[in-house]
């Protein structure tokens, strides 16, 4: 497998972390979303970037996941964290990010990012159905699909808490 493919599947090498590689692999989308929110980027642009991450890392998993399993000698190897990047990016999509110039917006954005991260890690580790049964799919799909499902679960929970319970809405940026 080429260096580029390995770099992509391990999220720049984060998948080689000695412990909690999935947690480390989940961090890049969180950092990108928070940076964009704190810089006042519009919600649509943050969502677009997150969906592009979902697309790029999903394609990488499906296309090169089988090669990675052969290289690392096991199904869904821990070094492959492109699935975590995709799932975490999905969990960060469509959130009610707020303009940082508005009072309290920085806290709202920080809580959204941290909440989405914790919710995704919780569901990714717990693997509630149907995510648990989808891990049995072959190759890259087996690596990816459970993380997309847990990313969707995290997104729903964060949306319900943020919009439903806390009444947060997107505050226009720019």
Language model regions located:
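A short, conserved beta-to-alpha structural element at the edge of catalytic cores
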Residues: 117, 121-129, 159, 166-174
């Amino acid at each position: 497998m080429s260096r580029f493919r390995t770099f992509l599947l391990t999220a720049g090498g984060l998948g080689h972390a000695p412990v909690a590689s999935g947690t480390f692999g989940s961090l890049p989308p969180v950092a990108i979303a928070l940076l964009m929110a704190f810089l006042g980027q519009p919600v649509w642009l943050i969502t677009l970037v997150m969906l592009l991450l979902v697309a790029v890392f999903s394609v990488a998993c499906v296309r090169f996941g089988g090669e990675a399993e052969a290289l690392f000698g096991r199904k869904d190897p821990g070094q492959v964290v492109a699935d975590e990047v995709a799932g975490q990016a999905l969990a960060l999509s469509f959130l009610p990010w707020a303009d940082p110039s508005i009072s309290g917006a920085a806290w709202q954005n920080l809580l959204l990012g941290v909440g989405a991260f914790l919710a995704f890690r919780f569901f990714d580790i717990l693997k509630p159905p149907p995510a648990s049964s989808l891990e049995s799919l072959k190759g890259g799909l087996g690596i990816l699909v459970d993380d997309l499902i847990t990313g969707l679960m995290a997104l729903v929970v964060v949306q319900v808490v943020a919009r439903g319970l806390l009444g947060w809405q997107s505050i226009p940026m720019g």
